[in-house]
Amino acid sequence: MTEHFRLSFNARRILATLRARGPRSRAEIARLLDITPSTVTRLTGALIEDGLLGEAADPAREGQKGFPAKLLTIEPGGVITAGVYIDPDRIMTCLSDLAGRVLSEETLPVPDRSFVAMMTVAGDSVSHQVEALGYARRRLAGCGVSYPGQYSEDPTRVMRIRQFKDWPSVNVARDLSPYFGMPVYHMNDAKAACLAELYHGACIGVRNFCHIWLSYGIGGAAVVDQRPYLGRNNGAAEWGGLFPKTQPRPSGQDLLDTLGAAGLPLDKLSDIEDRHLTLPVVAAWRERAAAQLQWLCLVIARTYAPEAIIIGGTLNPLIIEGFLETIRAAPQLGEDYVTTPPRILRAARDNRPQLGAAALPIHQLMNPTAYAGQAVKGL
């Protein structure tokens, strides 16, 4: 993060509160966060000066006598972030603001699947969009980059998926930044997509939820008290490990392999069209995969007990919607599960997975859990 956006712990708490709860007065913020009104006034004054907050009249006090109370609001254009999503089929980039509004975007073909080629295309795309929109560099909080792969014991490295087998051993803290000319933050595709739902999508204000991401593989993420829970080595909620690759599993690659074994070889998930969905082999796969995902939802409900489970990904949308219909229609989530189950939600932002990556710099800026310094009273 640039020096301009090095925010204190309590400044982050103020931004996080306004994001989750909407416009609030200074007095309300002081009560909610248990900090002094003078501290709130000082911190919010600096945030307004930096362009991160704005003020609006309180409609509840309209027409009343005395000095009208002002509500603090997040200023969407105060910060611009870049997002890059890379999968074996395409490269998707965007610029977005604090409200998650996409200001510009591109979807680009994969030139070849080499690391250098894909990152070069992504970096050039981001650079062109920044120049075209004419934003001041001081407003760019950074670029988020996401691509598939489980985390290894080294948190700076993710395991290579089959389609990226020729990539070098990438150090995400070192090897991505040269392509983008700004601070770069990495998270794998599933966990970045979860941030898009947390900050801009179906789970704004949902305190505890889990995310299931269905692409070539099966990924996921967990959010506890509105904060991503990553666990040891960023390995929390990696649901794919519950479905061994030597066995049938509810993944996009498994569907492609199933089609190939039936004499219908397809190279990419984007090659699966609506007309394929009625084929008997696909119908059987969907039925089996839906049962597996219902079992996964039961495991999540028993272990995390979240308010909601959100399902999304890059599989054909009709396949994902079919999974949700099956799980929601089940009389019980599982045997002896007699309490109210978590809500099963459709992801709202998986059509723009690059927006999840663009949320990474916002997370670094706004979320108190990302604060690397020491919390000091009054700051």
Label each residue range with its predicted role.
Residues 1-59, 64-107, 113-131, 135-136, ...:
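ATP-binding/phosphotransfer module of carbohydrate and carboxylate kinases, centering on a glycine-rich
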Residues 29, 102-133, 137-208, 320-333:
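Glycine-rich phosphate-binding loop and adjoining helix at the ATP-binding site
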Residues 71, 81-85, 140-144, 209-213:
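Short glycine-aspartate micro-motif
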Residues 96, 151-152, 222, 230:
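Hydrophobic alpha-helical segments, especially N-terminal targeting/anchoring helices
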Residues 105-107, 114-118, 167-168, 172-190, ...:
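Glycine/GP-enriched mid-protein hinge/lid loop-to-helix segment characteristic of carbohydrate kinases
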Residues 148-151, 215-217, 315-316:
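Short glycine-rich anion-binding loops that position phosphate/pyrophosphate groups of nucleotides
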